[in-house]
Structure formats: C-alpha cells, structure tokens
Amino acid sequence: MSVRYKFRNQEKLYFISFSIVYWIDLFIRNEYKDILIESLRFCQKEKGLDIYAWCIMTSHVHMIIGTRKDKMENIMRDYKSHTSRTLKKAIKDNPIESRKEWMLWLMERAGKKNSNNAKFQLWKQDNHPIEL
C-alpha cells in the first residue's frame, strides 16, 4: 500500500473505497449485499466501528467511517476477510447464480497472482483511506 493512503489517526474520520478483483459486478444480487450489511452491523456492535455514510455499488463499496474501539485497519482487515469467505460460500451455494464458475475462476486467478493470498482473492488489497 502506498504511504499516502493509510489510517494515520484513529480519532479522525476516513473516506474509504474498496473493490472486488477485476471489478466483478458481484453486488447486483441482494443476498450478497445483505452479507456486507450484516457484517457491518457486527463490526459496529463488536468492534466499535462508526459508520457515517455508506454506498454499495455493483463492484465496490464507499464508506465514511470512524472508530471508538479497535483500530480501523484491523476492523477493515477482519471485515474483508470475513466477507470474502462468506461471499465465496454464498456464490458457491447459490443455485441460480449463472456467473458462478466465471466469478470463482477470476477470484482464484487473482489469489494465485497475489503472494498475500493462498488460492483465492475476492477484494482488492487496498481500502484507499482518505482522512476527512
């Protein structure tokens, strides 16, 4: 990650933006968006995440966040890790997902190309945090 884009001050608000690998339009289905929202609620309740604004687009997410408890980089790491595993399972288990094989193939390809991952990558690595 660039030195320019980091969570430097935990007491400040940040605009963050993070996207699916290859800009896959994953969030055209409500069940996938619901996974993101449930996970955000968990982070609010258990990790002290404050969400001031959020927008789920078809291939990425924008948020304005702060924290009262855990460090923002740790919250986002855990959030993206959890949602990656949960979304992967939801895609695999969705009997009407016509794009299943294509999406999973691209995500596996991204994971193999990135030394930070073993075999699978759903989210791009960065959050592009900008202090407000």
Predicted regions and their residues:
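Short catalytic/metal-binding and nucleic-acid-binding patches
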Residues: 1-132
